[in-house]
């Protein structure tokens, strides 16, 4: 059984993608890609497919499980997991040249498709409304 497992992360959201030989199905939490919510961000999930070309995804099935974070971070985690999974699949079961070509196309379009965003939320501290913001002080 030819399959690879990759993950994508953004904020607190984690998406795990299983990529195996199939007939071009891509499912997120058991539902097809066309049902991803919110609708405005649906094209963000389609980006790896549009950039790489639908022909690259024709022979594989990708199942994605996503949890944690909010709507936007989950969308970014999903697209990263899909991109990383297809690159890993091409490296393992197809030739190295097409993998390098695919990786180059994805990175030129958007680096976050393959490289995780290291930014994390800074915890709030006392004496203010946020992590750095302080309450206003009066001297007289």
Curated annotation (Swiss-Prot):
One of its GO terms (molecular function) is structural constituent of ribosome. The keyword Ribosomal protein applies. It holds the Pfam family Ribosomal_S9. Keywords: Cytoplasm, Ribonucleoprotein, Ribosomal protein. One of its GO terms (biological process) is maturation of SSU-rRNA from tricistronic rRNA transcript (SSU-rRNA, 5.8S rRNA, LSU-rRNA). It comes from the Eukaryota. Component of the small ribosomal subunit (SSU). Mature yeast ribosomes consist of a small (40S) and a large (60S) subunit. The 40S small subunit contains 1 molecule of ribosomal RNA (18S rRNA) and at least 33 different proteins. The large 60S subunit contains 3 rRNA molecules (25S, 5.8S and 5S rRNA) and at least 46 different proteins. Component of the ribosome, a large ribonucleoprotein complex responsible for the synthesis of proteins in the cell. The small ribosomal subunit (SSU) binds messenger RNAs (mRNAs) and translates the encoded message by selecting cognate aminoacyl-transfer RNA (tRNA) molecules. The large subunit (LSU) contains the ribosomal catalytic site termed the peptidyl transferase center (PTC), which catalyzes the formation of peptide bonds, thereby polymerizing the amino acids delivered by tRNAs into a polypeptide chain. There are 2 genes for uS9 in S.pombe. This is Small ribosomal subunit protein uS9B. The lineage of its organism: Eukaryota, Fungi, Dikarya, Ascomycota, Taphrinomycotina. The gene is rps1602.
């Amino acid at each position: 059984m030819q399959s690879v497992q990759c993950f994508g992360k953004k904020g607190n959201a984690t998406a795990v993608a299983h990529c195996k030989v199939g007939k071009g199905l891509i499912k997120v939490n058991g539902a097809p890609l066309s049902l991803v919510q919110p609708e405005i961000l649906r094209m963000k999930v389609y980006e790896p497919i549009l950039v790489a070309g639908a022909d690259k995804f024709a022979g594989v099935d990708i199942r994605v499980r996503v949890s944690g974070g909010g709507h936007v971070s989950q969308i970014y985690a999903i697209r990263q997991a899909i991109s990383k999974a297809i690159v890993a699949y091409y490296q393992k079961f197809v030739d190295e040249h097409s993998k390098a070509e695919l990786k180059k196309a994805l990175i030129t379009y958007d680096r976050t498709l393959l490289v995780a965003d290291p930014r994390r939320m800074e915890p709030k501290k006392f004496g203010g409304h946020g992590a750095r913001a302080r309450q206003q002080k009066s001297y007289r």
